[in-house]
Amino acid sequence: MGMDKKLNYQKLKKLATDLGVAAFGVCDFTEKKDLNSAVSIAIRLSKSVLDEIEDRPTKLYFHHYRQANGLLDQIAMRISNFIQFDGYNALPVPASQIVDWEKQTAYLSHKKIAELAGIGWPGRSNLIVHPEFGSQIRLATILTDMPLSTDRPLKKDCGKCKRCIEVCPAAAIKESQKDFDHIICFEKLKFFQKQRYADQYICGICVKACNGK
């Protein structure tokens, strides 16, 4: 069984990498008894697109954000189909399916799955920080009952880096990630959306600031 788990892991990781995934990890999942593994995938955002952001989201970033989510959904679907052809069950969770915008919650937390799967650690900005790419990534998750080896969470943090705190237009980011102010953040997102800077509740300023350690 151990060899099967390792082989399955290697097959999925190769497929994901071939499809353009920049980071891949697996963790145990206990919230659904019939799907006990969670596969976390991440793709990189365009640095050139992010460089266009100054003090507000841009139309270009808004479209790029949607493109990234669409690509992740396609990749997650292809990985899920691969798993099903192998005789197992798979549930691709959309990259951006918000249940509550104000609390910034979804069907499940891609960020928590990514943390447990060793993709990165929770940053002060409430985003996952990848060791190389920082927070300039987007995430998706595939739940499955395929036997898979698992990864370990990274034992790292943001250290002395406070770039996201310095640039946050809402002052929502604090010294501790646990003190991140969701309400103030969302109020600023609503302002940006009302001003039609972007047709969705997004910002991108802290994403641009967090470009890896």
What are these language model-derived features?
Residues 1-74:
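Non-catalytic, usually N-terminal nucleic-acid engagement modules in DNA/RNA processing proteins
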Residues 67-213:
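Catalytic cores of enzyme domains
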